[in-house]
Amino acid sequence: AVGVSGAAKRKNALGENVIIQSIGACSGVIVAGAIFTLPALYILQAKYPEMTVTFMQVFISSLLGGVLGILFLIPFRKYFVSDMHGKYPFPEATATTQVLISGEKGGSQAKPLLMAGMIGGLYDFIVATFGWWNENFTTRVCSAGEMLAEKAKLVFKVNTGAAVLGLGYIVGLKYASIICFGSLAVWWIIVPGMSLFFGDSVLNQWNPDITATVGSMSPEQIFSYYAKSIGIGGIAMAGVIGIIKSWSIIRSAVGLAAKEMGGKSDAEKNIIRTQRDLSMKIIAIGSIITLILVVLFFYFDVMQGNLVHTLVAILLVAGISFLFTTVAANAIAIVGTNPVSGMTLMTLILASVVMVAVGLKGPSGMVASLVMGGVVCTALSMAGGFITDLKIGYWLGSTPAKQEAWKFLGTIVSAATVGGVMIILNKTYGFTSGQLAAPQANAMAAVIEPLMSGVGAPWMLYGIGAVLAIVLTLLKVPALAFALGMFIPLELNIPLVVGGAINWYVTTRSKDASLNTERGEKGTLLASGFIAGGALMGVVSAAMRFGGINLVNDAWLNNTLSQLAALIAYALLILYFIKASMKVK
């Protein structure tokens, strides 16, 4: 869009590109929402042939979830985008804004961005497509590290990609450190501790598929089966705490909508263009209509005409989607990563427990809970993604109402596309294993099946995470950032600290504050280039792999030398990042 508008010499190219970016981003958030849950329908259908999964179930759940996400987020736009301006890093929005501005201005700003984009893109493309060096460096590279991992369950990992390094720079050292501390608490305390205290035990009360003792598992397995659930509990409780803290904002947003519905407010007439949202009357009416459509969808399709099940389901979906909208937006504003899968997993667990209590269980209950989870997951994914678009528009002077209106169009097209593609991919490849194995959806299926069969969930682990979030809040430590670190894999958290440390280094080397600021801004340009280049070439590499072009030598990647090569390449990338950021004039 930037290139085409520049070549065509459009007068309002920047504003148009903001709208285009906002529409185009719909596909990513709709896919993220759908792919975490809805493939689980096909996974369970393979075990329960009596289950029916249709295109309309996938399409409607994605569409209605996306629309709800937009409608529920708009009342909170002003708080996250304007009122809290300068208090959240908004890493993804920062990177995209730099790309749009550089495309508009060209010259001195475009050159470092394009150079970093080419370097970061080529770097990540080489790793993903050719495998010249390993994507991750781990302490398993040597025999001592391997023994430490197997005996003590201690392991250190770092993703050596350019995109994640750039993301860490924009997040900054403060939040990156909190996220990393959460990750280290899980990987270096909880995982080894579980092996030490429960080494001879088989903890499978909530997952009968677990047959190994804790001591015989790898650190990664202990994290996946147990420790990650503590992070999920922490995210859920941090979300509840966030809801309580932002209750006045929620109340004022609902109050404003109620006033406008009653025709008692004309405040919108005095609002400047760059702060003008869609009318709260439109939002309220749109929300009611959408929820009615969800009720009809649930009643006639998912719940098979059971009114009680339908009413319970809509209360759960509407309540969780609305309340956790602020959590999704907050997570994106801090670290650029939406913990939507964790929140959706909690939604599925809650939905399953409640639906079983009202008499819906078995395969039909699995379908109902997964479709409910699909609506919630897509709504939260859309809310998190859209707050990024709105922040970009805020920085670049766009009219929020226009972004909001066009977002609905992108949602409709994306939902239809996702539904069709998902059915084709399931029939062609399947989601249970192989090239298109959907790990999050498989996890959802693994959790929901025993719940609907009356087995249970890891409530104790969720409770530990919840208590930890409360303690962190009392200690004035951002609980959501810490819990995100507990949930996100270690190898993705360490690069955030590395990038944040680079940010701190280049902005503190001089006694001249203006020079430090210039260096920081130059680093932001380079980080944005790393993110954009890495993301773009990642898509190209994935398309090649999907098309059957696999040029990676697995034998080489299994060799310890590939990890040493990764460390050298990563060090060179960091050196370039620092040198280029320091060189401002």
Where would I find each of the regions flagged by the language model?
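Alpha-helical multipass membrane-protein architecture
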Residues: 1-585
